[in-house]
């Protein structure tokens, strides 16, 4: 497929996402809102977009106000829709839930509508990350050439739909991206970087090349069987824990956008019990269960690469 055809499909898919989101928000407003609870988080400024989040103050919104914020959030796709001071790199998050009363027919209609939106979002992400054939550093420029000001994460982010929950509880998750690597895999990656010299601020091209050579030597000095692990922290994120009474099970969802909960009164479902979201404080985290970590030694800080001792 030619680059021109891909761009045509990219634009066409994005326009469909916009149209279907507009139709969904209109459709939801035709349904009876049983309960709504969302939590706005402080906006991240451009100056603070790379700073660690040690505290997050939560503001709660209820009822129609919560619904208005949520429906606007689903369609928040461009930086032009937000304050000029707000970071375009930090994700815009609005945890919470909207609960609507449905019958069998309207439940199926909304399920199909949301499924279609999520399919389009997945297709759009696939075009950008895979079909474009571009490295991650080049994708930003390519996407914004065709869709100026797009917040790609918001375009990728799918909607979460749940049916007939009994209880919904919110909380915070501290996570790491974990990837196990062999010594030879890391050496191969470093070799590719060495073969494509470039400058990386604040280093000159020569300084960066010297830094890569030192890293290569450090890895090459390890035994071939050395166990290496990338353990990169991800910024704390809101989560929702859903309890289904009939199935006697709990399901946890990431909750960057309000969950849509359909309450089917044809099946005798009732309004769920919805909890709040506490302020986040990194110095006051309580772990339910924290297994003993494997001893690791940091070997390449910029890659968050560790070796198991």
UniProtKB/Swiss-Prot annotation:
Q: Answer yes or no on keyword ATP-binding.
A: no
Q: Which Pfam families match?
A: Ter (PF05472)
Q: InterPro entries from the xrefs?
A: DNA_replication_term_site-bd, Tus_dom1, Tus_sf
The subcellular localization recorded is:
Cytoplasm
Q: Which UniProt key words apply to this protein?
A: Cytoplasm, DNA replication, DNA-binding
A single GO BP term for this record reads:
DNA replication termination
Gene Ontology molecular-function annotations = DNA binding
Name of the protein in question: DNA replication terminus site-binding protein
